Amino acid sequence: MEEPESQPRERRPGARLLILGPGAEGVRLDLFLAAELDLSRSQARRLLERGAVSLDGRPLAPGDKGRPLEAQGELRVEAFVAPADQRIPQPGEAEAPPSVLAEGPGWLALAKPPGMPVHPLEEGEKGTLLGHVSALRPEVHGVGEGGLRSGVVHRLDVETSGVILVATEDAQWDRLRGAFREHRVAKRYRALVEGDVQWPGDRLELELPLRVARHKPAFVRVASSEEAARGRSRVIEQTMQKLETLPGASLVEIEPRTGFLHQIRASLAHLGHPVLGDLRYGGSRRGGAHRHMLHAAEVAFEEVRAAAEDPDDFGSVLARLRSAESDV
């Protein structure tokens, strides 16, 4: 988990600062870079070949690619700046733009449609949420991490729909990133899950040690007691409430207090209730779920507040289940 920085650091366009914690211990450098930066292993190794990676201020070489990391330290990745017309995320030509839910000085809240990436992974990629934001608010360019991640405060999986925050000023980016890092942002998700959830009082307070078991494609599982004891996991916390019992499924609400890769999807699968449509974690196509039925319904931090209605596909699956017209 990243810790708040004690003093402001120089921000360079495209530079990434990665704080190493317990979850990084023993992980190969190239695998860690690939997972954290959404790269392939070959792309991560090319960063090393170009001298773009340093650890605690010491440049790393290509021969360090298999080096196991420790549970502390700072990795800095210097991105290579492309021509300006390529660095700006481009909106898609055919996609409907995500709707603006709320906005204030230096920030926007948008409703991310399912299937739309938050930001591009390479120059020239179109159809991302940030591409639409850059067309709507050009001042986002260079904010925060800059480059292809300009203004991005947090992320949602590509298939997950719902509220996403983007900063259009550096001061707001610092403030909001700090709030997410310190778990001061209230988040509420809705999910359609397999089976009839049986929790005492239809409510469950959950703490689980999770770890990334595979990076490409990412897969998260509950850590063994030995892995947890060695610090190779991260304890996640969330509150879950069953809202409705459906034929072969349940509608649940999740309020995560921590933020970890696939936290909600992996924890629900561990409990025997994978998200409908989430084939990676054991979910089925029940109700015609063509993607994982997980929706970020609300985000709130001080005056920054926004809520998003269920998208059409989520509502359609819910309606089919309610009328017992499931495909399964």
PLM regions: where:
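RNA pseudouridine synthases
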Residues: 1-328
